[in-house]
Amino acid sequence: REHLGVFCRFFLFINLFKLPFSQSAGIITGLITQNVDRLHQRAGAQNVIDLHGRLDQVRCLSCGHTESRSHIQNWLEQHNTLPSLTSVTLRPDGDADLPAALIDDFQTPHCETCGGVLMPDVVFFGGTVPAERVQTCYRMIDEAEGLVVIGSSLSVYSGFRFCRYAIQQDKPLIILNVGQTRADELCLHKFDDDPFSTLSQYVAQLDSQTPERQHV
């Protein structure tokens, strides 16, 4: 997450384009994603809830005001002497050994509204998803005819809770994932297969026929 400039330029994984296609066909009415990269939106998906927040924003811990991450990056570069990546050795975790003077003199921005402390607008491990966002997800499930989980082990409760909620609302739960998931015993159908190949076959079938459509 320290390398936002590089991270934002990654090519979209082609599999992300399959979901917007299903949306345009009337199969999928909304997406709940645990990703923080906004790649679903860049692929053309609509009605997406970023469950764990957005890495392209920062948020004030005091007043909740948000700013773009690129704006903060520009501020950091204008107010600090940043070393070239070629002059330091990055560790596998993205950290590096820097001169003490550089660290001591480093300036950090504050909220432009109230002067508060800023943080990336994401839910880190141990953090809590905002209650309002969770309720929005519940409403999305209420309006759907079922829930499909794609490419997640559901080991984190923030996503698993929606599987439990769907079952409580008598909604069918379908899982597409390689390997075991936390909700295997709850789902109506489990496809232990690669999401890329499975979705590719599914989209090909949509091209050739008009299936009975359920909103998920």
Residue ranges and their predicted role:
Residues 1-216:
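Conserved catalytic alpha/beta core of Sir2/sirtuin-type deacylases, generalized to analogous enzyme cores
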